Amino acid sequence: MSRRSEAPKRQILPDPKYKSDLLAKFINTVMKDGKKSVAERVLYGALTQIEGKKGDGIQVLEQALDNVRPRVEVKSRRVGGATYQVPVEVRPVRQNALAMRWIVDAARKRGEKSMALKLAGELMDAADSKGSAVKKREDTHRMAEANKAFSHYRW
């Protein structure tokens, strides 16, 4: 373990269009190679697509995140030469980060034409509790449930 103190959390600026911290975080998750304006265009395009089909885009985004957030995950723990998958609860900040990452990863694997359409599709699916990101969460929960016997190895 490092003896250095934990780095202070930097304050994230809200996004310029909706003034939302959540959207700013999501834009940063979508961003590749530091191209923030491209990531903004993708996310705002996805929200516009959602508003055309389902109504309020931000509400759909929040519902999607809520449906994808994992409550528990497994961490590897080595005990006497054997490695156990130990279920641990996920902190709220990490829950959000994982949910965003899983949604973006699932969207990138979809077949639609543009990234905005892929992201819109994945967000709408996640809001309806279906799609790859929700499946990933279910798999994570299933793994934790299967390894419940090793929960006493928690640290």
From Swiss-Prot:
It comes from the Bacteria. Disulfide bonds: none annotated. Pfam families: Ribosomal_S7. GO terms for molecular function: rRNA binding; structural constituent of ribosome; tRNA binding. Gene3D superfamilies: Ribosomal protein S7 domain. GO terms for cellular component: small ribosomal subunit. GO terms for biological process: translation. Belongs to the universal ribosomal protein uS7 family. Part of the 30S ribosomal subunit. Contacts proteins S9 and S11. This is Small ribosomal subunit protein uS7. It comes from Thioalkalivibrio sulfidiphilus (strain HL-EbGR7).
